[in-house]
């Protein structure tokens, strides 16, 4: 079939398998052209491995450090008549390129929050890898079924303690719109912490440790975003921020556990990028469009792969990691450069419907958004007939 983009709200409901493959190849080429990661990991588990930062971590480990990788994700395959999810196509492409390079690459499809998927992962590590020396935790999910209670909990993006009004882009109509968010209830805050906080990360590490599949010296990292003042009301000081602060609490006990075997655990702070998760946050399209404009003009703009490859090379496996006072690894310092933030803040209230494309890089934002789904990739013929039914040969699918 011939597949064109169809966008509804913050989701593109179609995906392009050839475009997704080309996007993965571009990221692999970036890593291989920038040289190997010295003293990098050799056997890596990535939880949330199919898109965005998790995919970039899997690519950086495999093609930067020659690592064997096991990826966990929750995606949907295509059929002859309907495209699958972008993460399915990304993972199919990654596995093919990694296998061609002689690397082990295998994936587990299912709910990473579940005990079942944790057990299947442990069994697969024992059978195929023995032990892993890096665990990357990169889950972004709107809800979680708690494995112990069976309760399904939802996360909420709301401020805490006050109503917040802020500007944003209505990405469908391409107009500036004011949005009012009411404060989160305590139940909503608790739910967000349960879904997006550190409990599941800790459950993963506890399960892997008890099963004896963590190598001596193993490291783990979970990805987070802090942002600057302009996003704090609805992010760091809001319900999501409470979940992110929970990561900072949970990492301490995880670090103690791994340190007993010479290992380490860190929260890694990454910059704002276009992902399926960030595009759902009402103010982020405007913030990202301004940030892209300012950072591109300064020559410091980066996407997922640049961020994560840099994090691996400079901090996770670097001699002098970028650490903050809380012990987090920082890869977001270019975004938080005071000059960059000052310009973003200056432009924030100047943007109107008329000058949207002039004052911001909304065009670049839209391109990056479509690239998530395999569109707008150079060299791909979007008028060609493609088969949406792409197989991942050795996948362990717990959803069927």
Curated annotation (Swiss-Prot):
Pathway: Lipid metabolism; fatty acid biosynthesis. Its EC number is 1.3.1.9. It is an enzyme of class 1 (oxidoreductase). It holds the Pfam family Eno-Rase_FAD_bd. It comes from the Bacteria. It catalyses: a 2,3-saturated acyl-[ACP] + NAD(+) = a (2E)-enoyl-[ACP] + NADH + H(+). The active site is at 235 (proton donor). GO terms for molecular function: enoyl-[acyl-carrier-protein] reductase (NADH) activity; NAD binding; trans-2-enoyl-CoA reductase (NADH) activity. Keywords: Fatty acid biosynthesis, Fatty acid metabolism, Lipid biosynthesis, Lipid metabolism, NAD, Oxidoreductase. One of its GO terms (biological process) is fatty acid biosynthetic process. NAD(+) binds at residues 48-53, 74-75, 111-112, 139-140, 244, 273-275. Substrate binds at residue 225. InterPro entries: Eno_Rdtase_FAD-bd_dom (IPR024906), Enoyl-CoA_Rdtase_cat_dom (IPR024910), FabV-like_NADH_b (IPR050048), Trans-2-enoyl-CoA_reductase (IPR010758). The keyword ATP-binding does not apply. NCBIfam families: EnoyACPredFabV, PRK13656.1. Monomer. Involved in the final reduction of the elongation cycle of fatty acid synthesis (FAS II). Catalyzes the reduction of a carbon-carbon double bond in an enoyl moiety that is covalently linked to an acyl carrier protein (ACP). This is Enoyl-[acyl-carrier-protein] reductase [NADH]. It comes from Burkholderia multivorans (strain ATCC 17616 / 249).
